[in-house]
Amino acid sequence: MSFEVFEKLESKVQQALDTITLLQMEIEELKEKNDALNQEVQGARESREALVRENEELKQEQSSWQERLRALLGKMEDVQ
């Protein structure tokens, strides 16, 4: 009878080891996915920052053109 108990215990230990191994593999896969997602987030963050800078530059350029246009309109009014 003790041999049967030993076999059951051995079987349960093996199942536990198999489960642990599978969970470790899953953890590694999730870590890799997490790293890939972190890189994707960093790339998106950098793209966003570049777009914000470009937007600011375009706003400044627009403001400059508006000032030039106002100056030209002012000169046209003076001529009339």
From Swiss-Prot:
Record carries keyword Coiled coil: yes
Compartments, as annotated in UniProt: Cytoplasm
Pfam family, any one: ZapB
Coiled coil: 3-80
Keyword Disulfide bond: no
Keyword annotations from UniProtKB, A to Z: Cell cycle, Cell division, Coiled coil, Cytoplasm, Septation
Gene Ontology CC terms, in alphabetical order: cytoplasm
Any one GO BP annotation for this protein: division septum assembly
Task performed by this protein: Non-essential, abundant cell division factor that is required for proper Z-ring formation. It is recruited early to the divisome by direct interaction with FtsZ, stimulating Z-ring assembly and thereby promoting cell division earlier in the cell cycle. Its recruitment to the Z-ring requires functional FtsA or ZipA.
Family per similarity comment: Belongs to the ZapB family.
Subunit structure: Homodimer. The ends of the coiled-coil dimer bind to each other, forming polymers. Interacts with FtsZ.
Protein name: Cell division protein ZapB
Biological source species: Proteus mirabilis (strain HI4320)
